[in-house]
Amino acid sequence: MLDSMLLVDDESLFHLVFEDACNLLNITLQLMTVDSTDAAEKLCQKWQSGEMKRPDCVFVDLNIVGSSVDGIELVRRINHIYGNGVVIGIISSSSDKKEITKATTAGAQFWIVKSDDIEPRLEKFKSDYPGYKSKTLSFKVYS
């Protein structure tokens, strides 16, 4: 079951779009949002120390202005250092095949193409989530 999510995105307006989409889809959960990879890494350290419960799923923007690393590097770090069972993927307006390949290499399980009309993509993701959690579903692009 999908109870908690972390959205890492530098666009505060998209935080609202994402939250509204979750509400429209009856995804009732704890949603945390941060605007930089640095803030996300601080949360990851809290997961590792047990100070904070890990989210079930992490959505990371590809290009996050003002961050020390890009979204793909954050995906790699979360997967290899802090992840241990967290479903993680990229959410970006880009659908560049080279970037998608880098994301899969870093350990991303999915890629959602960002838009103002994100609900249909999130709805498909929501139905696929159990497959990602059980690691029986392979990488997928939602566009």
Predicted regions and their residues:
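Alpha4 helix (beta4-alpha4-beta5 surface) of REC/receiver domains from two-component response regulators
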Residues: 69, 73, 94-112, 116, ...
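Short amphipathic alpha-helix used as the core "switch/output" element in two-component signaling
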Residues: 69-84
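A short, hydrophobic beta-strand element within the central beta-sheet of small alpha/beta folds
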Residues: 84-95
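Conserved acidic segment of CheY-like receiver
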Residues: 3-22
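Acidic, metal-coordinating helix/loop segments flanking the phosphotransfer/catalytic sites
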Residues: 19, 33-57, 121
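Alpha-helical interaction/dimerization surfaces of two-component signaling modules
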Residues: 20-25, 102
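CheY-like receiver
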Residues: 120-143
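Active-site residues of response regulator receiver
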Residues: 60-63
